Amino acid sequence: ENAMDKDEALAKQLPYNEMAKFGWIPETRDSKEKVMNLRKYFEVVELSLLENKQITRIACRRLAVTEKGDFALLAWVQEAKIKARNIETSPINMKELIRIIPEIRTMTVLKPKEFCPKIKRMLAECGIALVFLSHLKGSFLQGASFMDGNKIVVGLTARGKDADKFWFSLFHELAHIILGHTGQMDGTTDQDEKD
């Protein structure tokens, strides 16, 4: 089995059409084109490299765990990484992050258009790029945090309109960062939170 055949099989496990709908990758029906687009998107020479869990070390809040979901998760994380590249951040500063947590907590009563720009700016000053992404079916993801170069990326999903979930996910990811869990192999599930 050659690399293209193997990659075509792997491409079927990714939510290609949904990713294209969000504008993350070009639309196509051709399976070889899909593979080429996905290789470019993930910045790999072969999609089979995505099977190596070391390629993306993340800490995340997931609602379920499925193998197909792992590929959707990788796609979502890659989009967070791409968006974060356009966000200028100061050097990572944990003391400042800990200092601003109480101020961020006071924003829970504000509307998103009021708090989003302010939180993004405050976190950028701590070396954290905050990005918001659409929910990708199969990823069961609420949020993720990981290192990318000299910054920490926090990605949050726009899944659901529940403000409580947003704030829980944001503080959950910030706790991962403060506690040094950024780069954990597996995220937390709803079951973990109940235990």
Located regions from the model:
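Conserved binding/catalytic microenvironments
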Residues: 50-195
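Interfacial/linker helices and their anchor residues that mediate assembly or domain coupling
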Residues: 2-91
